Curated annotation (Swiss-Prot):
Protein name stated in the entry: Beta-carotene 3-hydroxylase, chloroplastic
EC number per UniProt: 1.14.15.24
Additional information: High expression of beta-hydroxylase (BHY) and zeaxanthin epoxidase (ZEP) results in the accumulation of violaxanthin, 9-cis-violaxanthin and neoxanthin in the yellow cultivar Gower Ramsey, while the down-regulation of BHY and ZEP results in the accumulation of beta-carotene and orange coloration in floral tissues of the cultivar Sunkist.
Gene encoding the protein: BHY
Upper taxonomic lineage: Eukaryota, Viridiplantae, Streptophyta, Embryophyta, Tracheophyta
Pfam family, one: FA_hydroxylase
Main location: plastid
Topology versus the membrane: Multi-pass membrane protein
Chain ranges for the short sequence motif Histidine box-4 as given in the UniProt record: 256-260
Organism: Oncidium hybrid cultivar
Amino acid sequence: MAFAMSSSLTLFQYQSFGKKPFFSRRRDFAGCSMMNPLVARCNRATEICCVVRKDGEAESLVEAENDQLEEEVMKPTSIDSFSVVLRSERKKAERRTYLVAAMASSLGFTFMAAAAVYYRFAWQMEGGAVPLTEMMGTFSLAVGSAVGMEYWARWAHRALWHTSLWHMHESHHRPRDGPFELNDVFALINAFPAVALLAFGFFHRGFFSGLCFGAGLGITLYGMAYMFVHDGLVHRRFPVGPIATVPYFQWVAAAHQIHHADKFNGVPYGLFLGHKELEEVGGMEALEREIKRGVKVFSSSPNQS
């Protein structure tokens, strides 16, 4: 084991204590700068440093410092590499966790919605007559509420989430630590009216009940599409496959990235019609640049998710 010995040799030490230096013979100080008046101008407090190796061979202090510096440089590099690996594994685990939750909720809602539609109209047709008016009302409200949710989300995003509810929505604009974020609560909040409308429309007969049932279906479909495009395609919380190469979805993803960059005072606040909002504020050039950047990132990504 190498160790360093440093001592300040002075005449006082050897005359007062009369002890020998460790690991060496008594030296003749006649030629030393402290005894010889010819060299008295030399520094009396010269510090001698050496590194003794296990095999007895001396090593210069500069070489020892260089070796130590190399070790210190190597340590952070290895630690950083290890941290990158751990962070990558953690992100993969978070994506798997969120993917399982997203798929479970999506499949669950899809199955329940399909079963509800089938059993509701089967129950309505027990008398033999096909309720065409009610069916058309249900279908119309399903489409209308899905489209209307885009405008509701745009208004709520601008007027609520970025103002009074920013303490919750802020988690979506910061790096995420874990598979979920506080902003996910908004998905649960929007699910309550959808479930209530579906339940009321399912257990009651009549045209109004059919409209409520259709509205609940539309909100549910929009929520599933929003989660798949916003969380999967834009923020890559789970893989979405080849839809990232579809031009329309490239516009959607690029427009939402511009929202996070806050280049146009937060515009666009909507998701599926975000490129239309950018067109109104003159942001199409920025949108084209963001699309090219996104395509380049997707092409260079090993997962291409």
